Amino acid sequence: MPALHSPGQTTCRGHIQDPASQRLTWSKPPLNVLVIRKIRDETLLEPFKELCRFLVEEKHLMVYVEKKVVDDGSLMSDESFSAICNQLCTFREGYDDISDCIDLIICLGGDGTLLYASSLFQGSVPPVMAFHLGSLGFLTPFKFESFKTEVDKVFEGNAAIILRSRLKVKVVKGMFQRNEQLFTTQENGVVPHNHISNEAGKITLQLQVLNEVVVDRGPSSYLSNVDLYL
């Protein structure tokens, strides 16, 4: 997942690489921007409106937001924002697929908002620009006070980015009996790659997530068995 960021150190193939060498370039000018804001946080209402006004009126972009954001009573009651609100494109999580039409994601909130934005894209993720307006900000390096300048820099191209890996999660049910040899390890303690690829069963859920996965026992009284491979 490409995330726009402030200068800092990253590793690449065993050596320290200057992040300044990783840059975002546009093959064509971006047209569609997804704005994700932290829900049920009234302090983000004004920053959200400021950003949308800027993107629509000054940058002349198509702005996508969640339908539940537009349906917010505080937003709908603002008559001065109604003209902008009518130009916003809305979508519903789990119903509308916007994965192929978004050029850039802008997040307003904390790390949780960024993780949520990542979950909306189960394939390739557009570049993400995250403004720190939440409780945690390890993944949100931009300050909103200078949002116009920062957004302009991104649209001009050559902005610094960091590529973040995501985890692929599969829930498999109805597993067939696995051959005992699949449980053996090599001399160095590494489980052979075909241990997983040879497993058979019905995949009931598959997700790509950023940072972490929580395995919950659900209605069961205990978690019977966990196989973890790295």
Locations of the language-model features?
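Short beta-strand segments
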Residues: 36, 107-109, 116, 130-131, ...
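Short glycine-rich anion-binding loops that position phosphate/pyrophosphate groups of nucleotides
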Residues: 39-40, 111-113, 136
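Short glycine/serine/threonine-rich phosphate/pyrophosphate-binding segments
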Residues: 44-45, 112-118
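Short, acidic/small-residue loops that bind anionic groups at enzyme active sites
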Residues: 121-143
